[in-house]
């Protein structure tokens, strides 16, 4: 099923060398005669004046231009001591700091990316000047570089050949590689011959008429039973029959079923049948149907209107499709008239009806191409029910385009030879631009690009041309070069300056090449770009063509009649030509070269078809043709060539086979493909166990030492090295090929000067040896490296096929998996993504690599240093850069060796998983996999399906943890089957130790103790205690490897036997063992820094603490049950015992000396709304916790002041309350005022004498805050009822006011002034002790003006009284609050203002005496103070003071009524007779003068 990694699939071809007399094609850069190595070396000697003894000791075999150019440019000494280092270098940072597996993984990632982004195979720029062929006319003449070798020959049985030769009408033959059968038609009989068994063949002879065409197609989906994978279509002269084919691949037994489906095709003469695999649609064309394309319809149902099988013409109307196909051609004279309008440039002198000769389909783009008998190509887009088009390409168009290119005037593309014999589509994966390749009768390949719209082809254009190789001799090449040099010299003269430059010699000779003349329709192109040409030549024709090509190009060509030559007998020669792009040269040097030669064949070729899958490396043009990337994982390409008597199997020669043939001199391989590829192949050959010891030894010698004196393989320090990864996407050009080659030859990559004290391992260019090792590992695993390890039930895109391209990663659809489906299956994972056979294949290959590294790993990783010392015979001081380079090399190679070991363990794990999934009696069904995965939690399964093979092979801690879950599942399953944990775990550790360490073994033993404890329950306390103690002790030993999931599982088993207090103690011990250095506490103390490495210890502790809290929740729930628990695993206990169990559990937690745990436990209680429990806790940590958390938690602050008050610490309680009232917490203003009130109450409580002064200061601050809060509350009330404010603004103001207590400045500037709350402003003046008289009086004026604006003067007394009441209320309210401040409430100034305000605003008759003075008295001003203020106003008034007199009169009368003492000193008569106050009749003044005392009256002036 799989190609063996370290075994050759066929015999190696004998080593061959090239003859120096053979002709060599020319490169595009240097036109020199190619007469072999000796001449090149001598010419180089003349130019350089340097000896060539080194090159002569290593003769170069082959005619590859790169090898010859390299030889020519070499000088004495070693050829590039650092050959290809620069080209292969990948700079990976962290060489000295990365973990080995991480470092190796980075290199594999980069190399995979590089392999997947190599150049596109066919670009126009590659061969504008002709194709650079490495060509030999001799059969298998390229020696080691011959692309194909004959592997086997299957002769057609004699009885079939005899019957074939006695056919009466028509015979045909072909190959069905899908069935491993050869088909042969003889008249009306079809024979299916088993290629692998000469005596096994089947005959289908149900047809009555001669068979015209046979085809094998895939059926439409859901039409036949699943066993039917193919349909056999047999077209006769009358009908087209359909047979169902079933093939048992295990036994190779073929079954043919007659479906009884057929359709009449009389008059069509079917010539070709093709199918569109995506839709299953079948198309065909016929010689008698002109240019029409038909479609065959079939179904599994038959009704009144539609038959099961029918045909429809897709290229003409329904009416015309009803007429006989050849009716038009039967009309006399039609052919002659048609011929008048046709191009007769082919010179055949006649005319014929144009018909289709071939159909082909571009399966990806959905285009069907037809080739006509007149070499016209037509393209149609396959739509749902029809064909859109056509887009036509005619020979005239091709000739016109050729005339505008360098291919103009090419004899091989003249009218006589511009006949297309075969067309092949180019898949978009191979080339996005190219659509089609057409082969001409002269062996020219015409490449067409195109563009598509949504439902049509927008354009098909001739893009490039590949001419066949030329067979000219070196003498002719030399003659042409001399001629071009003469022409070049002429151009230096003015007269010749306008002459056009001559075309390249290579192109000039290829344009008239006759090597592939008479190419037949059996020729083909096999992706990617492999050209097979079946050629028919006569011996006379071959001789004449060679003579013509080798004739002088400078003079006139020789005419056929110049000499009379004796005619030789004419014999036909059947040749098989193959030309394969050398992709190794293209990706290494950016130069396009094709290896071309003739292969041995026994007779006329009937068909050429690939038997195995192609070696496409990606699904995109970049990297598609990279055969080096897939050489270890893809099946070797085999091509079947069907002749008239046999089937010849040709096998593509892989790089390792080329290297084996060149083992005595691998220099050509190095020059072509680079030293890294050579080292990779050498390592591969070294590991082949079926090769000779000498061959493997030579390969190992090259891997370790290179070619001494010619190719040194060692690392180099270069500070300015640039990684090739950054330029992967740049397109190599021919202009860069020579430059890169010269750099390789002359040793361009030299150590850069560096500071001796400053060396970076990242600047080392590692040796090709390392890259060879890395490439082999990368390519071996390329198909699975980025692929998911496991599949889900919903992922149907993955099959169990061994290899799937890494460019199309598999992504499990976890989110699409329905919950009911998960619950039904109890699993997300369905299976491993690769089969057991595939795992064993990889494992066997990795084991061989691992054994190689065990034997040679130490010497290879340290080979550079000994090599330097061994070659340091001249006493040279070893440069520090060499030491650094060797150190980096050793690190990198050791990383790869460790990666191989890790891959081995990862694959071993998967192998164990398959083995454990085996169920006896059900081989290869792995029914136990579902049971194993069922032990894994769904959360872990979700992580497992995201796991790539890359993660498995270079596992981090998380990956190892996930794999351990599966290993634990295997152990659990074995436990259920009665197996021993010890035995199973030990076996797992031996096979995949990195996933099953010694700690895991201890963990498994602990789980075993817990399992037994659970089984015992509470029936036997001593045994139970024994197992639980042992389990906890074992788990505490492996605390560093104990995952939180395992810890949960262990605790769950402990709690099932009521092991609550000890479980809590165990968990807290685990938490402290995880963090023995108390790093978590340091992390907290330093403020939870974001990039602090100690955070991981903190996180671990928190996870364990959460388990403690979960345990406490469970014990709380247990205690709250009223009735005893009677579950199977728990003993019945009374409710009192449950309460005691909870009490002991909490005691175990609270007595544990762990500050961090206590803090988190208190946080947990608060989060559970059980903060009141904190008031009852007496631990050393509770008060510090409350004090620390109070500043950031409102709940904790409330708890703290209650905590203090319960312990009679009233000052501390008041202080906390004051802080709360002034804090930034989200507290309403009312609550803040309440806090202040409580705080004030605590200040008035009994407290120690030492706190008296502090309490007084605190009480003062509280009082100030209360006053401000009161004003803020007044503003809030006004805002609530203020209709002037917009609702949105009002909400914002309310939100601001109903929160934090603001400052007086904020209240004044942001609220009182903008909202014109004048009375509030006066209140703020008072509490702020503001004394600016002018500002204060201005605010009073604003207040009076605002009141005046509210008065509606209608002249009615009622309105006047309302206004008086309004004014009175405002002044009384203000006065009561500020009257004790003479600055804010200056009565001497306010009284006249109020009087003027009254009398200016209201009618005098509405003003009652005493209305004004009563306002001040009600506001709290005393009578005697008011008396002296009025008296002074009267005495100092310059104007009419009648208003003051009236108010004084009312004041004295009211004083008399209200004050008993006043009545005692003033006589009633004085009051009765006081009608109008004057200074002269003032009773108070009279009393003072008479008595000489003031009777204790406090005078205002004082």
Swiss-Prot record:
- Annotated compartments: Nucleus, Nuclear pore complex; Nucleus membrane
Pfam families, alphabetized = Nucleoporin_C, Nucleoporin_N
Q: Which InterPro entries match?
A: Nucleoporin_Nup133/Nup155_C (IPR007187), Nucleoporin_Nup133/Nup155_N (IPR014908), Nucleoporin_Nup155 (IPR004870), Nucleoporin_Nup155_C_1 (IPR042533), Nucleoporin_Nup155_C_2 (IPR042537)
Keywords, A to Z?
Answer: Membrane, mRNA transport, Nuclear pore complex, Nucleus, Phosphoprotein, Protein transport, Translocation, Transport
> What coarse category fits the chief subcellular location reported for this protein?
nucleus
Residue spans of biased composition, Polar residues class: 18-30
Annotated spans, Leucine-zipper: 233-261
One GO MF term attached to the UniProt entry: promoter-specific chromatin binding
* Function noted in UniProt: Functions as a component of the nuclear pore complex (NPC). NPC components, collectively referred to as nucleoporins (NUPs), can play the role of both NPC structural components and of docking or interaction partners for transiently associated nuclear transport factors. NUP170 probably plays an important role in NPC assembly and organization. In addition it is required for chromosome transmission fidelity.
Something else known = Present with 1560 molecules/cell in log phase SD medium.
Quaternary structure note: Component of the nuclear pore complex (NPC). NPC constitutes the exclusive means of nucleocytoplasmic transport. NPCs allow the passive diffusion of ions and small molecules and the active, nuclear transport receptor-mediated bidirectional transport of macromolecules such as proteins, RNAs, ribonucleoparticles (RNPs), and ribosomal subunits across the nuclear envelope. Due to its 8-fold rotational symmetry, all subunits are present with 8 copies or multiples thereof.
Protein name from the UniProt record: Nucleoporin NUP170
From which source organism is this entry? Saccharomyces cerevisiae (strain ATCC 204508 / S288c)
């Amino acid at each position: 099923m799989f190609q063996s990694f370290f075994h050759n699939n066929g015999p190696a071809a004998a080593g061959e060398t090239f003859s120096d007399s053979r002709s060599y094609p020319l490169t595009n850069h240097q036109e020199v005669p190619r007469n072999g190595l000796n001449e090149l070396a001598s010419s180089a000697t003349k130019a350089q004046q340097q000896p060539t003894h080194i090159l002569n000791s290593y003769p170069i075999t082959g005619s590859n231009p790169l090898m010859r150019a390299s030889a020519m440019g070499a000088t004495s000494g070693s050829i590039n001591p650092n050959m290809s280092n620069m080209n292969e270098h990948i700079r990976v940072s962290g060489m000295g700091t990365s973990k080995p597996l991480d470092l190796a993984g980075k290199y594999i990632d980069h190399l995979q990316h590089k392999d997947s982004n190599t150049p596109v195979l066919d670009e126009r720029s590659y061969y504008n000047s002709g194709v650079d062929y490495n060509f030999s006319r001799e059969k298998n003449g390229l020696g080691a570089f011959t692309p194909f070798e004959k592997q086997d020959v299957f002769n057609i049985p004699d009885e079939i050949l005899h019957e074939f030769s006695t056919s009466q009408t028509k015979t045909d033959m072909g190959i069905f590689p899908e069935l491993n059968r050869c088909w042969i038609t003889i008249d009306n009989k079809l024979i299916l011959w088993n290629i692998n068994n000469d005596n096994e063949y089947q005959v289908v002879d149900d047809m009555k008429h001669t068979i015209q065409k046979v085809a094998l197609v895939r059926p439409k989906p859901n039409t036949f039973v699943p066993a039917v994978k193919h349909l056999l279509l047999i077209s006769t002269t009358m009908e087209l029959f359909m047979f169902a084919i079933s093939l048992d691949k295990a036994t190779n037994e073929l079954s043919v079923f007659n479906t009884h489906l057929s359709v009449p095709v009389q008059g069509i003469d079917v010539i070709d049948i093709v199918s569109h695999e995506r839709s299953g649609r079948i198309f065909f064309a016929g010689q008698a149907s002109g240019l029409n394309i038909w479609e065959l319809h079939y179904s599994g149902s038959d009704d009144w209107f539609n038959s099961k099988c029918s045909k429809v013409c897709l290229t003409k109307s329904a009416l015309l499709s009803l007429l006989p196909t050849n009716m038009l051609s039967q009309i006399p004279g039609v052919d002659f008239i048609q011929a008048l309008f046709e191009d007769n440039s082919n010179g055949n002198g006649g005319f014929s009806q144009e018909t289709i000769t071939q159909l082909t389909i571009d399966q990806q783009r959905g285009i069907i191409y037809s080739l006509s008998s007149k070499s016209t190509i037509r393209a149609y887009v396959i739509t749902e029910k029809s064909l859109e088009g056509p887009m036509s390409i005619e020979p005239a168009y091709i000739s016109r385009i050729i005339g505008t290119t360098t291919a103009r005037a090419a004899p091989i593309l003249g009218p006589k030879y511009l006949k297309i014999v075969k067309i092949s589509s180019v898949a978009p994966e191979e080339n996005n631009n190219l659509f089609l390749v057409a082969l001409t009768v002269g062996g020219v390949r015409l490449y067409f690009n195109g563009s598509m719209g949504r439902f049509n082809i927008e354009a098909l254009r001739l893009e490039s041309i590949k001419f066949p190789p030329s067979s000219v001799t070196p003498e002719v090449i030399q003659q042409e070069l001399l001629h071009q040099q003469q022409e070049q010299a002429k151009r230096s003269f003015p007269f010749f300056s306008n002459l056009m430059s001559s075309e390249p010699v290579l192109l000039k000779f290829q344009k008239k090449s006759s090597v592939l003349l008479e190419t037949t329709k059996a020729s083909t192109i096999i992706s990617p770009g492999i050209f097979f040409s079946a050629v028919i030549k006569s011996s006379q024709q071959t001789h004449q063509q060679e003579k013509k090509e080798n004739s002088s190009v400078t003079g006139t060509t020789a005419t056929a009649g110049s000499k009379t030559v004796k005619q030789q007998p004419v014999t036909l020669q059947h040749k098989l030509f193959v030309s394969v792009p050398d992709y190794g040269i293209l990706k290494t040097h950016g130069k396009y070269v094709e290896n071309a030669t003739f292969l041995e064949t026994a007779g006329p070729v009937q068909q050429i078809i690939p038997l195995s899958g192609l070696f496409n490396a990606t699904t995109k043009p970049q990297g598609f043709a990279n055969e080096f990337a897939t050489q270890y994982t893809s099946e070797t390409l085999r091509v079947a060539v069907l002749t008239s008597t046999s089937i010849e199997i040709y096998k593509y020669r892989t790089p390792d086979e080329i290297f084996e043939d060149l083992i005595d001199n691998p220099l050509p391989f190095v020059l072509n493909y680079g030293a890294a590829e050579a080292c990779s192949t050498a390592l591969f050959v070294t590991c082949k166990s079926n090769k000779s010891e000498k061959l493997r030894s030579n390969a190992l010698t090259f891997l370790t030492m290179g070619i001494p004196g010619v190719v040194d393989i060692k690392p180099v320090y270069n500070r300015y090295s640039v990684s090739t990864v950054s330029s992967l996407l740049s397109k190599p050009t021919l202009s860069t090929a020579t430059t890169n080659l010269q750099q390789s030859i002359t040793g361009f990559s030299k150590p850069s000067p560096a500071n001796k004290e400053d060396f970076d391992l990242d600047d080392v260019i590692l040796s090709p040896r390392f890259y060879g090792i890395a490439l082999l590992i990368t390519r071996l695993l390329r198909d699975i490296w980025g692929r998911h390890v496991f599949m889900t039930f919903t992922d149907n895109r993955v099959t169990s096929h061994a290899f799937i391209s890494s460019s199309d990663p598999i992504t499990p659809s976890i989110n699409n998996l329905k919950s009911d489906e998960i619950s039904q299956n109890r699993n997300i994972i369905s299976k491993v993504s690769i089969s057991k056979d595939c795992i064993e294949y990889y494992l066997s290959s990795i084991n061989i690599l691992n054994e190689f590294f065990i034997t040679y790993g130490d010497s290879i990783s340290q080979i550079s240093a000994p090599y330097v010392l061994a070659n340091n015979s001249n006493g040279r001081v070893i440069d520090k850069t060499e030491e650094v380079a060797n150190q980096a090399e050793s690190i990198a190679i050791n990383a790869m060796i460790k990666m191989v070991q890790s891959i081995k363990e990862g694959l071993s794990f998967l192998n164990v998983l398959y083995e454990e999934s085996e169920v006896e009696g059900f081989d290869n069904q792995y029914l136990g996999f579902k049971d194993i995965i069922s032990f894994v939690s769904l959360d872990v399964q979700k992580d497992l399906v995201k796991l790539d093979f890359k993660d498995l092979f270079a596992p981090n801690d998380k990956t190892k943890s996930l794999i351990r879950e599966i290993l634990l599942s295997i152990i659990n399953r074995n436990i259920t089957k009665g197996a021993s944990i010890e035995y199973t775990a030990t076996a797992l550790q031996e096979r995949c130790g990195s996933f099953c360490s010694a700690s895991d073994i201890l963990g498994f033993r602990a789980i075993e103790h817990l399992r037994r404890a659970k089984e015992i329950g509470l029936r036997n306390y001593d045994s139970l205690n024994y197992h639980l103690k042992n389990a906890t002790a074992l788990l505490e030993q492996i605390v560093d490897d104990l995952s939180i999931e395992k810890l949960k599982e262990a605790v769950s088993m402990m709690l099932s036997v009521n092991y609550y207090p000890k479980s809590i103690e165990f968990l807290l011990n685990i938490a402290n063992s995880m963090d023995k250095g108390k790093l978590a506490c340091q992390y907290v103390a330093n403020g939870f820094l974001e990039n602090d490495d100690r955070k991981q210890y903190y996180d671990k502790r928190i996870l364990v603490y959460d388990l403690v809290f979960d345990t406490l929740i469970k014990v709380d729930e247990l205690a709250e049950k009223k009735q005893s628990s009677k579950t199977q695993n728990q003993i019945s206990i009374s409710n009192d015992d449950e309460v005691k169990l909870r009490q002991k559990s909490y005691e175990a937690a609270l007595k544990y000396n762990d500050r961090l745990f206590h803090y988190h436990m208190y946080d947990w209680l608060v989060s559970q709304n059980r903060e009141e429990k904190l008031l009852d806790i007496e631990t050393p940590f509770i008060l510090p916790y409350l004090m620390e958390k109070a500043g950031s938690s409102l709940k904790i602050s409330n708890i703290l002041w209650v905590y203090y008050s319960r312990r009679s610490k009233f000052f501390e309680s008041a202080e906390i309350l004051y802080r709360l009232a002034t804090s930034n917490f989200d507290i309403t203003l009312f609550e803040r005022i309440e806090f202040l009130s409580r705080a004030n109450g605590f200040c008035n409580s009994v407290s120690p004498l030492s706190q008296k002064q502090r309490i007084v200061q605190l009480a003062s601050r509280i009082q100030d805050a209360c006053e401000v809060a009161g004003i803020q509350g007044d503003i809030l009330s006004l805002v609530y009822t203020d209709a002037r404010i917009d609702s949105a603004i009002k909400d914002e103001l309310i939100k601001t006011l109903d929160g934090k207590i603001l400052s007086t400045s904020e209240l004044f500037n942001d609220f009182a002034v903008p909202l014109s709350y004048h009375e509030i402003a006066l209140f703020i003046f008072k509490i702020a002790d503001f004394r600016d008289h002018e500002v204060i009086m201005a605010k009073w004026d604003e207040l009076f003006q605002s009141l005046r604006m509210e008065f509606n003067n209608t002249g009615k007394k009622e309105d006047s009284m309302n206004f008086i009441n309004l004014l009175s209320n405002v002044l009384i309210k203000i006065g009561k609050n500020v009257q004790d401040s003479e600055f804010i409430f200056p009565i001497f100034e306010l009284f006249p203002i109020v009087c003027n305000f009254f009398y200016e605003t209201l009618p005098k008759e509405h003003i009652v005496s005493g209305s004004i003075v009563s306002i001040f008295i009600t506001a709290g001003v005393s009578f005697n103070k008011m008396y002296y203020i009025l008296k002074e106003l009267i005495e100092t008034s310059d104007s009419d003071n009648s208003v003051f007199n009236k108010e004084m009169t009312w004041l004295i009368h009211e004083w008399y009524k209200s004050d008993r003492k006043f009545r005692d000193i003033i006589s009633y008569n004085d009051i009765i007779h006081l009608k109008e106050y004057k200074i002269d009749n003032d009773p108070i003044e009279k009393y003072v003068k008479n008595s000489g005392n003031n009777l204790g009256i406090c005078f205002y002036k004082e």
